[in-house]
């Protein structure tokens, strides 16, 4: 009989960091509120939530790497908003941000103890799309990235219980 491992949304054990880009702050602050609210609703104490702010999404990967290296957090949620303009700037910023956070997430998952890094950076064509995804119409993507983080933290804990690695 195969063994199945799934994450869940039970109250996770450990501390969480939320890394938020200040650029497009009217959007990213809504994402951050959604993330904090989701953690609290899932049993994480205020004292176990730290919020770090950086200038923009391009700076997020470096910040996330520093935060994961502290080994204080079981989960790190990254939040930002890149909105397409009339120049190729969007492509460079969005692409480098995604690659950088992805690389940190890969390293963090392989570390002992494993850490979860989730991606909650909006990449939209218009301001209206970003506003909708920050909670007006299409749900709050900050909350969604946080749910993914909680689920993965709990999955890694279950895996560690069977593979001998420290959660």
Curated annotation (Swiss-Prot):
Report the Pfam families cross-referenced here.
DMRL_synthase
What pathway does the UniProt record associate with this protein?
Cofactor biosynthesis; riboflavin biosynthesis; riboflavin from 2-hydroxy-3-oxobutyl phosphate and 5-amino-6-(D-ribitylamino)uracil: step 1/2
EC category name: transferase
Q: Which UniProt keywords apply?
A: Riboflavin biosynthesis, Transferase
What is a single cellular component term in the Gene Ontology annotation? riboflavin synthase complex
Q: What does this protein do?
A: Catalyzes the formation of 6,7-dimethyl-8-ribityllumazine by condensation of 5-amino-6-(D-ribitylamino)uracil with 3,4-dihydroxy-2-butanone 4-phosphate. This is the penultimate step in the biosynthesis of riboflavin.
Its protein name is: 6,7-dimethyl-8-ribityllumazine synthase
Recorded source organism is Myxococcus xanthus (strain DK1622)
């Amino acid at each position: 009989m195969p063994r199945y491992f799934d994450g869940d949304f039970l109250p996770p054990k450990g501390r969480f960091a939320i890394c938020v880009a200040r650029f497009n702050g009217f959007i990213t602050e809504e994402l951050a509120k959604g993330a904090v609210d989701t953690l609290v609703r899932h049993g994480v104490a205020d004292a176990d939530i730290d919020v770090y702010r950086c200038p923009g999404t391009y700076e997020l990967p470096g910040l996330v790497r520093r935060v994961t290296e502290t080994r204080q957090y079981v989960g790190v949620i990254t939040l930002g908003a890149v909105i397409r303009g009339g120049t190729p700037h969007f492509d460079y910023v969005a692409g480098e941000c995604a690659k950088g956070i992805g690389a940190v997430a890969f390293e963090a998952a392989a570390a002992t103890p494993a850490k979860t890094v989730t991606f909650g950076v909006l990449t939209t064509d218009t301001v209206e799309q970003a506003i909708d995804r920050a909670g007006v119409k299409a749900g709050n993507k900050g909350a969604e990235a946080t749910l993914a983080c909680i689920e993965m933290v709990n999955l890694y804990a279950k895996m560690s219980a069977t593979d001998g690695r420290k959660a």
